[in-house]
């Protein structure tokens, strides 16, 4: 069910990210220009085309989620909003840990739902944080085992 992404998956990957950003991040950032102007499927497809080597999808006949793994860093993990709470995110995260030894990620400080998800999978906030570029928000570093 989890496989390396192909060029044919790019539209679906981008669509999943757009849906998630608008649903979960727009209420925090409230930037119409970005969320309804710049954040578009075609531009994300172009961005991801050069990163296919780090993209993996959960595919059970339909691509329902994806994860981007760069070395041991989890750069992105998104599941189609209508498919959440069905163990898809867990499967993607467990794959990253088992197959790529993924052990760290940055999470938006106000994204408590994501933080709880990662905590359930053995990740813990390290106390290190950095500003989210161009915003007043912060990202928190989470590591597996809190190392």
What is the role of each PLM region?
Residues 98-110:
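Conserved GNAT acetyl-CoA-binding A-motif
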Residues 118, 123:
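Conserved active-site tyrosine of GNAT-family acetyltransferases
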Residues 18-45:
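Conserved GNAT-fold acetyl-CoA-binding loop/helix
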Residues 106-108, 124-141:
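Conserved catalytic-core motifs of GNAT/GCN5-like acyltransferases
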Residues 70-84, 107-108:
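A short, internal acetyl-CoA/4′-phosphopantetheine-binding micro-motif in the GNAT/acyltransferase core
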Residues 1-15:
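A short beta-loop-alpha structural element at the N-terminal edge
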Residues 52-67:
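Conserved beta-hairpin
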Residues 83, 87-95:
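Conserved acetyl-CoA pyrophosphate-binding loop and the N-cap/start of the following alpha-helix
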């Amino acid at each position: 069910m989890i496989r390396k992404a192909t060029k044919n998956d790019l539209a679906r990957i981008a669509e999943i990210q757009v849906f998630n950003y608008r649903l979960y991040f727009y209420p925090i950032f409230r930037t119409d220009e970005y969320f309804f102007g710049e954040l578009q499927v075609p531009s994300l497809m172009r961005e991801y085309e050069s990163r296919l080597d780090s993209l993996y999808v959960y595919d059970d006949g339909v691509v329902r989620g994806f994860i981007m793994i760069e070395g041991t860093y989890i750069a992105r993990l998104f599941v189609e909003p209508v498919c959440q709470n069905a163990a898809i995110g867990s499967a993607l995260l467990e794959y990253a840990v088992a197959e790529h030894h993924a052990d760290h990620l940055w999470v938006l400080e106000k994204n408590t739902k994501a933080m709880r998800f990662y905590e359930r999978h053995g990740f813990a906030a390290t106390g290190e944080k950095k500003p989210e570029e161009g915003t007043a928000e912060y990202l928190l570093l989470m590591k597996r085992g809190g190392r």
